[in-house]
Amino acid sequence: MIEFCVGSYEDSLKVSQLGAKQIELNSALSLGGLSPSLSVLKRIKKETDLIVNCMVRPRAAGFFYSKYEKQIIFDEAKLFLENGADGIVFGFLNEDGTIDTLSTKDMVSFIHSYQKTAIFHRAFDCTSNPFEAMETLIDCGVDRVLTSGQMPTASEGKDCLKGLNQRYGEQIQILMGSGVNAQNASELMAYTGIKNIHSSCLGIKEDPTTTTSKVSFSYLKGNGYESMNLEKVKELLNV
């Protein structure tokens, strides 16, 4: 299974037209992905047959949330589930880097009440012990976990990924992501035994109104912003 990490309505339509079957829908990919717009989800579900898993993440940085942030996370999950989301992508950690078991169990139960998929995101890669964390997620009833093996890229984390899959691959679906592309996907799948991959296939688009002689809204070099590179998508779909 290939899941594409998508940050816009336009990119969702384009990857669907290329033959993609599943996406993780976000906004603000430059921040690691935040909750998407409800209107984007509704249009995608109306106009494509994509399986759409929606991120619920209210802010940048880490995953130790206040009670106010948790209220918003659950409110957003409800809105997405009521409007066609096939799964919810979330992550709750305690201050010490362990899984926030209570919030995770509550979210899994809520998602499963809609008979949808509960997916723990790369907050997993910030946990203090990946094997203990995986056991906790299994005990909480999580269906799938996205991970790079606690390294910046899956290639760097391949030994951890292999170990996790050998120990837990029959109990929870492991989705391998971060830096996975057409050039390394086959090798990584063979080495780790993980057959499910997650990729953003990022490219850069230019917006000439980003910068003037006096004002700049640039956050990348020049006037660019993240968008999917469709050639990379095609290559990965052909692996």
Model-flagged regions — what are they?
Residues 168-239:
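C-terminal alpha-helical cap/extension of soluble enzyme domains
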Residues 7-14, 64-76, 125-140, 164, ...:
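Catalytic cores of alpha/beta
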Residues 24-34, 79, 83-95, 142-155, ...:
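Glycine-rich phosphate-binding active-site loops on the catalytic face of alpha/beta enzymes
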Residues 2-6, 23-25, 52-56, 88-90, ...:
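Hydrophobic faces of well-ordered beta-strands that scaffold small-molecule active sites
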